[in-house]
A protein has these predicted regions:
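Conserved catalytic core of nucleotide polymerization and phosphodiester-bond processing enzymes
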Residues: 1-139
Length: 139
């Protein structure tokens, strides 16, 4: 295995979930599991382990995206920068043309700094007049 620390972390998540009955995101949101109903069923136990690991990883991602949405809303003018859609870890905003040069660096700074992790968060930004015409934004 090229990533022994990741394997250890995943095993830790599985063991903690078996002990506590829940998986917890880095921001404290919990997903509960009914351990009694699956005890002794290897298939269901393995399924619960996969669900617990996914809940922590994907749930933490969702928590961070929500924090970013709140931070962007608080800092930027909602009349000129409107959230349109969230898809997994992507956010789609409608930004007034005269605000793009000001808004993009601020949005990037907000999103990359909204939650500190051991690894830096990286944000890719695309702009366009329609979803199908989006091009990577180079500031």
């Amino acid at each position: 295995n090229d990533f022994p620390e990741i394997k250890k972390y995943i095993e830790h998540l599985k063991n903690e979930t078996k002990k506590t009955g829940y998986a917890e995101t880095m921001l404290g949101r919990k997903r509960f599991f009914d351990l009694e109903s699956i005890r002794g069923n290897g298939f269901l136990e393995a399924q619960m382990e996969r669900m617990a690991v996914n809940a922590v990883i994907q749930g933490t991602d969702a928590d961070i995206v929500k924090l970013a949405m709140i931070a962007v809303h608080k800092e930027l003018d909602p009349q000129k920068i409107r959230p349109i859609l969230q898809i997994h870890d992507e956010l789609l905003y409608e930004v007034a043309d005269d605000m793009i040069k000001e808004a993009v660096p601020r949005i990037r700074r907000i999103m990359e700094g909204v939650y500190k992790l051991a690894v830096p968060l990286s944000v890719d930004i695309k702009i366009g007049k329609s979803w199908g015409s989006l091009l990577k934004y180079e500031s």
